[in-house]
UniProtKB/Swiss-Prot annotation:
SUPFAM superfamilies: Adenine nucleotide alpha hydrolases-like, Class I glutamine amidotransferase-like, GMP synthetase C-terminal dimerisation domain. Keywords: ATP-binding, Glutamine amidotransferase, GMP biosynthesis, Ligase, Nucleotide-binding, Purine biosynthesis. ATP binds at S229, G230, G231, V232, D233, S234, A235. It comes from Corynebacterium diphtheriae (strain ATCC 700971 / NCTC 13129 / Biotype gravis). The lineage of its organism: Bacteria, Bacillati, Actinomycetota, Actinomycetes, Mycobacteriales. Residues 201-399 form the GMPS ATP-PPase domain. This is GMP synthase [glutamine-hydrolyzing]. The gene is guaA. It comes from the Bacteria. Homodimer. Residues 11-200 form the Glutamine amidotransferase type-1 domain. It holds the Pfam family GMP_synt_C. Its EC number is 6.3.5.2.
Length: 525
């Protein structure tokens, strides 16, 4: 699928110099309806050429170009004839490689900064003086030969430059963040007016191309199974593959006992009604609980759940083949892996492995299926757009994300049936009250976490109790790469807390997780 997409859309490559916003830059490019991918700064010139990029964007980073071991830009990259846009550290690395001057001016700029426009294409028709988001110590003091300085600030004599002839430009500030109000306009101007790219990355053609890619991978006679988790990702992946190969796809819903209240029934009704897909439900609750017995380490949990998913599918294949023509096999496994999953699992050289995603790093080495991952290069909002393009109802498309490992990674400690019942009850109360308050559209998701290995002292019924705390983790996000905690109304929080402590046994405390991502991931495990 990756090759198929790359052939039709030469990517804008975001070269990651260690920036926390590299994925956000890629998102902003896609918001401009242009396809993008992230590559590490360690990518060689030959590796970059092999991707046939439409343009390069050099990300920010925490280093100084003069520091020992600082990531550098191979000057040959700038000789490929590819449009290049530098941001913050990428702007300085670009300047350094082209023979300009980067200096420590002693005037650092962090946060909102007033910048003055001196002309050029990038900032045409914008206010002469406006706010941008800066985060730098060093600054470009002399632009490379042939480049026109188009903006400055108090701490950055060269806050932006461009060379239309070479199709290169750069800015010292961060146009990708919302704190730079005109940042997206500036990025679009580079992409369209300086780089000359077409804006043709849309939900309609994404869906069409992904369907074609699945057809090419599975072939005219291949059969596939798809594991449904109850979430939007697996639902859209299944709908795409069904559109490609029809009844040669069988969807398998594994009831692993790690589901929320009503999850199984909802999948069996909503998804089948929306797609008409063949659905087989298998009860594997006992197998999963046995596999998780005694497991407390988060990474071990994810890998155990991922491995048992595969074993469950293998056990389901025999039943599926009973209805297939004699001699048929099932060779393909469809998964709803997304681009953030790949990135967080260390998707590429030089990329940190934050945690194994059950679809990426949590699979056993002896998988008997070929993986079909039609959403592997998409962000969550793109998945929703493709789902709508395929005609899936809003009840499925707008569903809040729910991880494949389910409640198993929302119990801090060993997973037991008793603890699952406790968490399931608390989760249902939280979801019910958020829906009743009309807040579903305002939050990305609200994981409810049981601190099963923690005992909290409480007073209930005039007596001392030692119960478990429940954590509410409401977050707002665009794509799960970054997230902020959602400021829920106090009265809603109070109602959720009161109901949980009154109605859920062995829980005597409810706490709010107000950590953004970064530093914390959305899920606790």
């Amino acid at each position: 699928m990756t090759q198929q997409t790359s052939q039709k859309h030469n990517p804008v490559l975001v070269v990651d110099f260690g920036a926390q916003y590299a994925q956000l830059i890629a998102r902003r490019v896609r918001e401009a309806n242009i396809y993008s991918e992230v590559v590490p700064h360690t990518a060689t010139v030959e590796e970059i050429k092999a991707k046939n990029p439409a343009a390069l964007i050099l990300s920010g980073g925490p280093s100084s170009v003069y520091a020992d071991g600082a990531p550098s830009l191979d000057p040959q990259v700038l000789e490929l004839g590819i449009p290049v846009f530098g941001i913050c550290y990428g702007f300085q690395a670009m300047t350094h490689a082209l023979g300009g001057t980067v200096a420590n001016t002693g005037n650092r700029e962090y946060g909102r900064t007033e910048m003055t426009v001196d002309g050029g294409i990038l900032h045409a028709d914008l206010e002469e003086t406006h706010k941008v988001w800066m985060s730098h110590g060093d600054a470009v003091s002399v632009a490379p030969e042939g480049f026109v300085v188009t903006a400055h600030s108090e701490g950055a004599p060269v806050a932006a430059f461009e060379c239309a002839e070479k199709r290169m430009a750069g800015v010292q500030y961060h146009p990708e963040v919302l704190h730079s109000p005109h940042g997206q306009e500036v990025m679009v101007r580079f992409l369209t007016e300086i780089a000359g790219l077409e804006q043709n990355w849309t939900a309609a053609n994404i869906a069409e191309e992904l369907i074609d890619a699945v057809c090419a991978q599975v072939g005219p006679e291949g059969r596939a199974i798809c594991g449904l988790s109850g979430g939007v990702d697996s639902a859209v992946a299944a709908a795409l593959v069904q559109r490609a190969i029809g009844d040669r796809l069988t969807c398998v819903f594994v009831d692993h006992g790690l589901l929320r209240a009503g999850e199984r029934e909802q999948v069996q009704t909503d998804f089948v009604a929306a797609t008409g897909a063949k659905l087989v439900t298998v009860d594997e609750r006992e197998a999963f609980l046995n596999k998780l017995a005694g497991v407390t380490e988060p990474e071990a949990k994810r890998k155990a759940i991922g491995a048992e998913f595969i074993r469950s599918f293998e056990r389901a294949v025999a039943g599926i083949l009973d209805d297939a023509p004699e001699g048929s096999t099932v060779d393909f496994l469809v998964q709803g892996t997304l681009y953030p999953d790949v990135v967080e699992s260390g998707g590429g050289s030089g990329t940190a492995n934050i945690k194994s995603h059950h679809n990426v790093g949590g699979l056993p080495d002896d998988v008997e299926f070929q993986l079909v991952e039609p959403l592997r290069l998409l962000f969550k909002d793109e998945v929703r757009a493709v789902g709508r393009e395929l005609g899936l109802p809003e009840e499925i498309v707008n569903r809040q994300p729910f991880p494949g490992p389910g409640l198993g990674i929302r119990i801090i400690g060993e997973v037991t049936e008793e603890r699952l019942e406790t968490l399931r009850a608390a989760d249902l109360i939280a979801r019910t009250e958020l829906t009743a308050a009309g807040l579903d559209s305002e939050i990305w998701q609200c994981p409810v976490v049981l601190l099963a290995d923690v005992r909290s002292v409480g007073v209930q019924g005039d007596g001392r109790t030692y119960g478990h705390p429940i954590v509410l983790r409401p977050v707002s996000s665009e794509d799960a790469m970054t997230a902020d905690w959602t400021r829920l109304p106090y009265d809603v929080l109070e109602k959720i807390s009161t109901r949980i402590t009154n109605e859920v046994s062995d829980v005597n405390r409810v706490v709010l997780d107000c950590t953004s991502k970064p530093p914390g991931t959305i899920e606790w495990e």
